[in-house]
Amino acid sequence: MCVQVMLLAGTETSSTTMEWALSLLLKHPETMHKAWAEINTNVGQARFLDESDLTKLNYLQNVIDETLRLFPPAPLLIPHESSEECTVSGFHVGQGTMLLVNLWTIHRDPKLWVEPESFRPERFGGVEAEGYHYQLLPCGVGRRACPGAALGRRVVGLALGALIQCFEWEKIGESEINMLEEAGIVIPRAEPLEALCKPRQTMINLLYDL
């Protein structure tokens, strides 16, 4: 695989996921506070969180999983091709047929999820996301799953966790945050997210020393 393709795919999907996560957290400040409280308890205020902390930040991981459920970075994954003729759920699939997986629909299917349109990170509490048996598939599954999935989760976890740990976030103005999506292979926000952030008083010295 071309290194340039891997880098572009990794940066675009990760940055899009972080923008959606911040949008959801600004829309649900109580969730933002809960994520910050978890970081404060497990990491403290004397240092920045690092990769080794991520395994202790279960609620932060739940926030990421719920963001990926509602706004999968690649809602149709990548095209696959059937290697042989087959029948799936009564549908004939010829050999060589291009196949797409509609993650957006699967992730919002009321047969699979309680209140599928609601942002509820708690739904993943106490359960590994992979344990949702083909319900949560932001990176595909099996041999052809995204090879950068684990790295992407670490990047998003570290970046999002640092933004929550170090800064207080507020939406700008009284109007609701626009959650409309733009069409594309990756689904970005229709409007770039604008928000107000200021350093947390407890983190100013650490930030100053960077």
Please give the residue ranges for each predicted region.
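Conserved cytochrome P450 catalytic core segment spanning the I/J/K helices
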Residues: 1-18, 50-53, 57, 86, ...
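Amphipathic, well-packed alpha-helical segments that form the structural scaffold of globular domains
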Residues: 4, 36, 40, 64-72
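Cytochrome P450 catalytic-core helices
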Residues: 13-31, 36-38, 150-166
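Conserved cytochrome P450 K-helix E-x-x-R motif and the immediately C-terminal K′/meander segment
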Residues: 29, 48-90, 110, 117
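Hydrophobic, well-ordered secondary-structure elements that form the walls
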Residues: 35, 67, 93-96, 119, ...
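Cytochrome P450 proximal C-terminal region
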Residues: 40-42, 134-135, 139-210
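Conserved cytochrome P450 K-helix/beta-meander segment immediately N-terminal to the heme-binding cysteine loop
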Residues: 83-85, 101-128
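Generic beta-strand/beta-sheet core signal
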Residues: 89, 96, 101-102, 198
